[in-house]
Amino acid sequence: KQHHIWGNGTSPVIAGDRVFLNFGPGPKTTLYCFDKKTGKTLWEHHEPGGDSGKAGNKNWLGSWSDPILRQTGSRHELLMSYPGRACAFDPMSGKEWWTCEGLTKLVYNSPVYADGLMIAMSGYGGAAMAIQTGGSGDVTEKNRVWYEPKVQQRIGSGVIRDGHHYILTDGGIVECRDIKTGKLVFNERVKGPGPTGQNWSSLVLSADGLCYAANQGGDCFVFKATPKFELLSTNSLGEKIIGSIAVSDGHLFIRGYKNLWCVGKK
């Protein structure tokens, strides 16, 4: 059993015959690895969980991040963002390969990976950083490529294309950063006719380099994943949207408060 005042929002990650799950946030935060067929626990890693937020407790910390599994050089690494740090585990044994300090207490989105770099970001005006993967032990001094101590509040996860990281912030601003330097290339506000531009959802990147996003005002945006911002379309569904857009078989699925939408060619 797990409880946090803001709820839980992580998803299981399936890789081969294994399932990985960040069971948190909450007092019993644990990263689990299960056998996909039997449900047997193969290994588990415990992380400090903080308070649940009930009864006036204010030690609010936690990670809503999903782990991601990537090939980094000669090995696979299970990459994870936690309060205070980013880290990597051996997906077979659960052994911690490396850790890098720098994140703040609240981690809302999942890490992303490209070109040997893990991009990890805190929420609530916290820090962001890039880490060279493939290390061992505490790599804060050696492998932390860049570090920004305070960035805009973001809840949804970003995407990477051609050496640039794109994310839609809580306030409805599209950010683009160079993944090797952390330099902010652009930040552009996107706003439709909906009553609010606030955003909690993650971006979706298509194979042809287009980003799709939806905000809480029910506005959906399509823009190019290029270092020069180009908004291609804005469409309003007329209802509140909090969840991220899902993609399957060439179709977009959007869950609103009233309807489930499917967008694609007939």
Cite the ranges covered by each PLM segment:
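Noncatalytic, solvent-exposed loop/strand surfaces
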Residues: K1-K266
